[in-house]
Amino acid sequence: AQGVAFKDEIMGRLIRFVSAHEVGHTIGLPHNMGSSFAYPVDSLRSASFTQKYGTAPSIMDYARFNYIAQPGDEGVALMPNIGPYDKHAVRWGYRPILEANTPDDEKPILDAWILKHQNDPMYRFGKQQFGVIDPSSQTEDLGDNAIKASKYGIANLKRIVPNLIEWTAEDGKTYEDLEILYGQVLSQFNRYMGHVSSNIGGVYEYYKTYDQEGAVYTHVDREYQKACLKFIQEELFKTPYWLIDTNLSNKIEFDGTVDRIRVNQARTLNNILDFGRMGRMIENEALHGNKAYSLTQMMTDLRRGIWSELYSQENIDPYRRNLQRAYLDRLEYLMTESQEPVSPLMRRYSNQTRVQVSQSDIRAVVRAQLRNLKQTIS
């Protein structure tokens, strides 16, 4: 769909999967944001796999578009279908159990249906989160590796940006469509940053009952967390010049390019330097020692990346200077502010690690980073 208007065939398929999703809600199915984590990333480039399984095992996930597919991946499905999880959930909820005379008689049979698929990721349920703690249960993400999936997604965005003017061109029209689509590219890029950064200090949640083995909550692997921060440093904190196209920006605005990059960088930076995330990293180290990606190590890696010019002696461009100021602003915030309370309305739905900041290690770690930075600068 290299343009603003979709063909009727594509629009029909879009309506079909959105309608199926909403019908799922009407029969009692909640969002299943953990569904898409079941598929290996590269399987979503396979025509045979995606034609059979779609983009996720459940239509109730937000796995709307296959951003992993690359040019040349012929026949790859780009949209979700009703999947094995959906059929299983509907069967569990609605299939008559004729041999049961009472609800208590039904329970062991229903439990057996669940246990039959307990080790199959296609049948996993992951709740919708307002404040991501479990990075495997996010909206709009695909596949089992956020770094790999996001690299494919960014590769596609890099192909889109140089063509936006041509794809939106129409004699007699303004550049409004160009502005809208460029904004959508930025939004999608920001989603990828969120998908990856949520792994830092992340904790997986896999529902279990007493008769199932293993932990319900597991911290994200140390090396993967480190890799996620490295990805953010390389793809976002190093100025993403591919998003800066003067031939495009001079058609949609008189200013805004520099600040737009600042906003996107600061948003992800603040997401990483979140009180709750930092609190989980402290707890992970307390529980697992050297196996954890400690808050001190993460903060050191972050500082060295954002202030890399102090070591390389490279020039600091305006975008990087803005990022460095945002870093200082955020550290000031961490030293002087406390965690914002959750409103009573959102308390039921919000995932948030509560931290008593003044009595935690957070400010001690931040203070040490500021001292190290001061020494490096001087």
Say what each PLM segment does.
Residues 2-19:
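Short pre-active-site segment immediately N-terminal to the catalytic Zn-binding motif
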Residues 5, 36-378:
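Conserved catalytic/binding loops enriched for acidic/polar residues
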Residues 11, 30, 38-39:
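Active-site and adjacent substrate-binding regions of carbohydrate-active enzymes
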Residues 17-32:
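Active-site recognition of the HExxH zinc-binding catalytic motif
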